[in-house]
Amino acid sequence: MASILRSPQALQLTLALIKPDAVAHPLILEAVHQQILSNKFLIVRMRELLWRKEDCQRFYREHEGRFFYQRLVEFMASGPIRAYILAHKDAIQLWRTLMGPTRVFRARHVAPDSIRGSFGLTDTRNTTHGSDSVVSASREIAAFFPDFSEQRWYEEEEPQLRCGPVCYSPEGGVHYVAGTGGLGPA
C-alpha cells in the first residue's frame, strides 16, 4: 500500500475492459491488472460483471452490419468481463498503446510486449477494449458505471487524486487518497 505523490497535470479518464477470454484465466487477468498498475494508471472504479446480449448489442451498435458484429456480441456475452475506469494524464492513448493493435497477428509482430501481443488469441478474443476518444470514454464509462458522475469526479475526486499522495487498496482494487483509509472512492 505504498503512497505515491501525483503530478499536478490534469488526469484523463478512459474505460478499459478485460474480455471473457482473459477473465477466464486468472493468471492472465492478474498479469493485465499488474500492467495497469505498473504503468501508473490510477484505478478509479472497477467491477466484474456478466454482460447481457442486449447490452452488448447496444454498446457495439456502431459495428452493426459488419461481418464481425454478431461474433463480437456473442463473445462479449459469453462470460464475465472486468471493467475499469482508469485515470492518467494521457489515459486514452497510454491504454491504447499498452493494449496494442486490435488485430492480434499485427500486435504479435509490431507490439509483441503489448497486452494483445502477449495474450490475444484472435481479433475478437483479443483480451482488451479501450476507449478511442474523450467522447467515447464518457459514453462507455456511463454504460458500465451508470452511477458514476464524471463531472462530480472531476470536481471532487480528480484534484485530490492528481495532487495528493495516493495509495492502492488490493482489497478494493482501486486507488484512494492517502489518509482516507481506502473506504470507497476518494
Curated annotation (Swiss-Prot):
The keyword Iron does not apply. Transmembrane segments: none annotated. Expressed at a moderately low level in many tissues. Most abundant in kidney, prostate, ovary, intestine, and spleen. GO terms for molecular function: ATP binding; metal ion binding; nucleoside diphosphate kinase activity. It catalyses: a 2'-deoxyribonucleoside 5'-diphosphate + ATP = a 2'-deoxyribonucleoside 5'-triphosphate + ADP; a ribonucleoside 5'-diphosphate + ATP = a ribonucleoside 5'-triphosphate + ADP. One of its GO terms (biological process) is negative regulation of mitotic nuclear division. It holds the Pfam family NDK. Major role in the synthesis of nucleoside triphosphates other than ATP. The ATP gamma phosphate is transferred to the NDP beta phosphate via a ping-pong mechanism, using a phosphorylated active-site intermediate. Inhibitor of p53-induced apoptosis. Belongs to the NDK family. This is Nucleoside diphosphate kinase 6.
